[in-house]
């Protein structure tokens, strides 16, 4: 969330609509001061609507935590139409201000030509250690019609977690949304073509490639004005870490206060067509970090009482039937229960890669 060096709270607007039949989300929060940068302040109770240039209007439903959503059955953006976001603060801000975006045209975006990965050698094998490998995920796209010159991508990673012990919650899945700003300008290129563009790098410092990994990428089209906005935001985020770290209030978005044009409003209302592609990686990579190497902390006979079992101590190996019998304990819950990092609910798409084989 953007952070500013002002005592007065300002409205922050984040969200977008697309041409897909899906739920679109607009999030409203209040800007935070320097000393409260980790405090997110959702704005509830506002009246949020979207209208187009044909005088159609849709009222968004409040879904909690500052989120306002469209009805996936009744709203779908149309390429070529212009959309305007309106926010009635409904008394949540002084003077009962209302806010409005500039009309935003929903621009087309080309299909994703290819999404693929490459194995990368991070450190070569030596007599003392095995090689360390990672993975680069790349994308190709082009637009012969030249209707899209400014691109933006985001993605969601999902990977399988398998504990090395036979415990009840052994297999889980977890997901992570991209936090970096990923954009590309082709307006100055001789051809509107993007080849081998790096989306993500998965290093050996994570276990994401240990079993099975998937990445879903979304491709969007931007106006030149929105590209300039994200380009400025990218420069700021490179200095501070990610999009969710400090963002100075000097980056002007496309939303304004009707009653007071000098009132500063943060964030951007994005409008774009969307194309998606998913990739699966189920290969063996050398030298990945072992997150479970320090799991065992004690070995006891099976008849010995275990104080705080299930609260601060867990059994990861039950060798009660072995000779001699034993149990191995850990003081790290994540070694005995994969739900510490994920969920046991299998993603509905997890076997989609096998359908094409």
Give the label of every model feature segment.
Residues 1-357:
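A sequence/structural signal for flexible, mid-protein segments enriched
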């Amino acid at each position: 969330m953007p952070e500013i060096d002002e005592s007065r709270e300002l409205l922050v607007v984040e969200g977008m609509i697309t041409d897909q039949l899906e739920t679109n989300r607009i999030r409203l929060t209040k800007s935070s001061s320097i000393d409260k940068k980790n405090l997110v302040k959702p704005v509830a109770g506002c009246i949020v609507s979207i209208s187009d240039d044909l005088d159609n209007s849709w009222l968004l439903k409040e879904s909690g935590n500052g989120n306002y959503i469209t009805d996936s059955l009744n709203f779908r953006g149309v390429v070529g139409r212009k959309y305007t976001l309106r926010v009635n603060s409904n008394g949540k801000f002084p003077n009962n201000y209302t806010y409005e975006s500039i009309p935003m045209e929903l621009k087309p975006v080309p299909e994703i030509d290819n999404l693929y990965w490459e194995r990368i050698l991070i450190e070569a094998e030596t007599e003392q250690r095995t090689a360390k490998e990672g993975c680069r995920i790349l994308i190709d796209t082009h637009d012969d019609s030249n209707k899209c010159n400014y691109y933006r991508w985001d993605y969601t990673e999902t990977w399988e977690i398998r504990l090395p012990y036979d415990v009840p919650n052994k297999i889980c899945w977890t997901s992570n949304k991209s936090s970096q700003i990923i954009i590309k300008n082709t307006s100055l290129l001789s051809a509107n073509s993007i080849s081998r563009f790096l989306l993500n790098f998965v290093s050996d410092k994570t276990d994401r490639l240990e079993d099975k990994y998937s990445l879903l990428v979304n491709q969007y089209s931007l106006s030149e004005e929105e590209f300039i906005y994200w380009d400025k935001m990218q420069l700021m985020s490179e200095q501070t870490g990610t999009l969710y770290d400090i963002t100075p209030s000097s980056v002007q978005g496309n939303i304004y206060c009707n009653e007071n044009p000098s009132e500063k409003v943060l964030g951007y209302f994005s409008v774009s067509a969307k194309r998606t592609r998913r990739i699966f990686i189920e290969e063996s990579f050398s030298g990945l970090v072992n997150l479970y190497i320090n799991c065992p902390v004690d070995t006891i006979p099976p008849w010995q009482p275990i104080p705080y079992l299930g609260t601060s101590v867990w059994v990861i190996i039950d060798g009660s039937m072995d000779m001699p019998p034993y149990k191995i304990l850990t003081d790290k819950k994540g070694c005995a229960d994969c739900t510490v990092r994920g969920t046991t609910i299998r993603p509905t798409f997890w076997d989609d890669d096998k359908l094409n084989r």
